[in-house]
UniProtKB/Swiss-Prot annotation, chains A, B, C, D:
Catalytic reactions of this protein: 5-O-(1-carboxyvinyl)-3-phosphoshikimate = chorismate + phosphate
EC code: 4.2.3.5
Cofactor(s) for this UniProt protein: FMNH2
Name under which the protein is recorded: Chorismate synthase
Length: 364, 364, 364, 364
């Protein structure tokens, strides 16, 4: 296992789905950053199931607790430990089906890698619930990068094959609260909701694409040749369970363009060098170029479905089938939005510190 | 800058396009691995321009030199330094157009990040030539993971929009040497070659998609939650200039499937647990599951084109236009194949060491 | 701040002296290690003030809590979070003298480095209490290295200038529980206790030397050229507040010997290569040589004394004097023994994993 | 093996004593630092044997070569690779005695750890010659920290038991060039030279103590709780072969002082907070306090002596004896001075970058 991420803004994740808690330690946060517990709670609530229709109906009362690193509402320079307690855990279903490895989940690989000692309840360490820790860390990162003006906003760009129209930045901010699936194209949003309803009734699940945008990035974030802005973001985002693809700007589409179309011409805008298009997604040579950062993330359909699936019984080493009971998100894409945002904030915070753009003490 | 990659199998890259050399130090290679200089040379030759038609016609006589870490044809446990000298460098064109930042290149971001001190000749540290170092390191990694049976093969899956038929593993090995563009679908290969010819005549360039496959991986490679197999591979592959997207298995396509179609059912094959499909690309929960690893890589069209492009003159801060002279690859996708293979080998070597699957001393 | 230590066995420390808690996350512990909460509690109790005479009389009721990473009494491969709550904290004295920087403490450097945002209560992050976290992590490390037979024992070798006779290993284990100062030379122990009594009455404090011994180390721990066994141990041990010197084997004494006396001759003992003396402290070329590891640690006298000291008032920037009230250890050397042991166990665990000597799954 | 050191100013060492070369890659050097090859050469020459009497008489013609990272005499932000070629190597003596492990050397531990594959010629990777790479990196670090006014000076404080009088800083700079053993106390220097002569005639060797001083350090270098200034320096210095002890300020002597004597009182000097004594060696809480840094390093006597020593024959696994022929330094302490200085510069450069005190681009 390797549960730390980042070089100067470094997060260390701990906890399990059905253990005592999910938590994170954030090291390297500059001293003097004003932090209010509610600012972190808001981000965690965004991710929370039950916040909106059509995700897990069980109610998670996720109150965050600050254990260290914040004193008189300012960061101290010391590591910040944040925890959410797990409550009302019922592991009986996992005990019942324990020997049957769930397709699309980490039951098999986890069992093999950890010699059967891994906590299998609720997926244990592989559960999407672990990302609550990422989101807490992301809230601190978001606050930190806001001191240099960076804003990070994400949305559901595609769900079950339904594609949202490309939104303007202000539409994302305005419309997203009106959508049950975090999609600013409200017409598409309605279709997505209907499709989730239908898939849920069929006992099946859906995937989609999250797009995340970073605004007001300075030129210079990214540490080539290995710690590129793309590479660091991709690594962080692949830590979100169910992510199977990451692309920047025109991405896979760029591979079908000619150079004359794909190259973003430079020109001078308000005395600054900008590009007139943004196929590169705000990144050239692995370094932010001052244009908006664009990253798109492919999320596979939720592997937990109630339809019967062929699988193997680990105890008897025989073929069998499995029906997963209980309530699971039909589509996690809307919830993944806040996690993709969090990972983006975390990486930008780390790279801004590494580039020397954010100082070691924040002076308000 | 950050020029080291990997935790136990760690490579450190150095050199510039028009400097003295391109080199790499590889630390953490177990002692006792038999290494012949020719094995490394073969990989470098694969990447070399001029090896096949339609890539850069200039001839690079890239003889690798071993500076350290290998004694009596075996690794010693000490760091291995490998170097290729740069020869017959002509930087006059770069001097001529120095103040005009090339669209699609790192000229602008490099200038800004390094305060104008960066070596701009031939793209300096951002040049594709730097990947010759990655390929040397990849050759060592390839030899190391072959001791546990892993094989890594890549090919051109798509070029300028032309898609190769999905090949069988043996076809990749057999056909690729007959293709000028590293495409085992020889019919598609012919079309790709013709398209390159045409784009070259038009002064334009093409992109494409590289697919890379890992065979015979043990179950257990990948260190979640942050150092997942996907995340580590993606980060390494984004260190290749021009890569704008990475996906695993069904990738972005998976986001449009239902769970019942995307989940790979388990069954028992020859007393081993395998899946009957491989939409997950051989990775579950960030850990290899024993099925073939599948990664697909989007490569943007070469940014160096001879068509005129709008850009900015850094010295005068005025809008201008640029025509890039000299000979450049119309499409780097065929050459990128060996680099994607190299990065894959490097990551697998690191993760196999981290999983304790490769010992610290190799005993033949 | 940098609060993580280790490469494969990695600990991340958090918490403050007068905050909610002191805690540690331990990542990289192999799955399958049997862990009982009492085993960790025993180590924490050893460090605890009040356990023996002449250290801080205040009673710390330090019950450890396991938050993650242990399931059914075995490690799971997931990160282990351990916490001790801070109770009955009275920060009034620190509030009273806040502006007067305490000589010998980190008040001044902490204030300067963190822009005055650091938690000054009880020394905050610089307090010796933070080492309770190190000791919890050390307990896990101790259990892990015991699986390959390694034993780590420490003792007070010198206190206030009184030197203990060099003990036999079995005497350390037997006598130490009879000494109030963790000194196996019981005659010297009595003198040390008397000296502490005297210094306490005078409002002054004492320092000393801790010796720590590692038994049954395999040959091969240490990763030169930079991560030597000496270097890794020294770095870890200097994380203990008040440590000002570290030496191995004959140490500074070796610098006054001739080579013919200092070199440890090899010979064959029970079919194994051993040295007939151990001036090198069990380390050659930065790597364990199979002989007992010997490290000696200089601990400065407790900086908190009740005698009046000249200092500066930060608010007024004027010279002033300070008398520190409250109860403080007259000598922390006896308590430092368990912390030095803990750091030694942590480093040996990390290096044993790095050398591939401890597997990724422990099979009992 | 682990051959990289540092987090932001990161050096990677390679090469062997009797291989092609000794080299180093330095990553993370800010762009815009003026570097002249002669500045590096001067430092390497200081370390060079033959530069002064009584060290190895063989003449090393160590001309450094810059392979990358410097363009038009300024650093570019790219990794800097520096190399010294090994010339006139005669390995015959090592071939002759190969099976006899040399007491006090790493022959035994190296053989065991690397399964016999290690390059044994001249000690291979464990040779003191490797420190030539450290010194090259140290020259770059020295130049970098000079941009914020830091000066690092070292000297022979003790040799074979002869102790130099504590020098004033200006005496170190002035007198050291007049001493054949880098000792500014010229009377002691004469005695040391005579003692070396005598030990050489007896076929024996001597050790000693190097003191290194850092002047004009800003307050704030050091990243507790684990990456303390003491810990980072100690780790780096223990990478020098033959070092067996490291202490700061009063060091082991502090352990025998009372708190009232050891605490350094604060007062205001020229509007700045300073201490009136410096028992802490310029470090409080693991962070520089603005006073001179004092570190003392115990160097064991050279293990290579011409007197006969009992040892073991690895091939036959029998007891035997060994006489080491050839010319070896009777005492390496004078040469170690420049290496201790180099390691100190390297650590200070890294910590100054980590503290945000040195910017990412140097503007002259």
């Amino acid at each position: 296992m390797s549960n730390s991420l980042g070089k100067l803004f470094q997060i260390t994740s701990f906890g399990e789905s059905h253990g005592d808690c999910v938590g994170v330690v954030i090291d390297g946060v500059p001293a003097g950053l004003a932090i209010n517990v509610d600012e972190i709670q808001i981000e965690v609530d965004k991710r929370k199931s039950g916040a909106k229709a059509h995700t897990t109906p069980r109610r998670e009362d996720d109150r965050i607790e600050i254990f260290s690193g914040i004193f008189n509402n300012f960061t101290t320079g010391a590591p910040i430990c944040l925890v959410i307690w797990n409550k009302n855990i019922d592991s009986s279903e996992y005990e019942r089906t324990r020997s049957k490895i769930r397709p699309g989940h980490a039951d098999f690989t986890g069992f093999m890698k950890y010699g059967g000692f891994n906590d299998y309840r609720g997926g244990g360490r592989f559960s999407g619930r672990i990302t609550a820790g990422h989101v807490m860390a992301g809230a601190i990162a978001r606050k930190l990068i806001s001191t240099i003006g960076i804003e990070v906003i994400g949305y559901t760009a595609e769900l079950g094959g339904i594609t949202a129209k490309l939104p303007k930045h202000k539409d994302i901010r305005q419309n997203i609260s009106q959508s049950d699936v975090n999609c600013p194209d409200l017409a598409a949003s309605k279709q997505m909701v209907a499709l989730i309803q239908q898939a849920a009734e069929e006992g099946d699940s859906l995937g989609g694409v999250v797009e995340c945008i970073g605004l007001n990035l300075p030129v210079g974030l990214g540490e080539p040749v290995f710690d590129t802005l793309e590479g660091e973001l991709a690594k962080a985002i692949f830590a979100i369970p169910a992510v199977k693809g990451v692309e920047f700007g025109a991405g896979f589409g760029a591979s079908r363009l000619r150079g004359s179309k794909n190259n973003d011409p430079f020109n001078i805008q308000s005395d600054q060098i900008r590009t007139t298009s943004n196929n590169c997604g705000g990144i050239l040579g692995g370094i932010s170029d001052g244009m908006p950062l664009h990253v798109r993330v492919a999320v596979k359909p939720t592997p937990s479905i109630s339809l019967s699936q062929p699988t193997v019984n680990l105890d008897t080493m025989t073929n069998t089938s499995l029906e997963i009971r209980g309530r699971h998100d039909t589509c996690i894409v809307p919830r993944a939005v806040s996690v993709v945002e969090a990972m983006t904030c975390i990486v930008l915070a780390d790279l801004a510190l590494r580039a020397g753009i954010i100082p070691r003490v924040i002076k308000q």
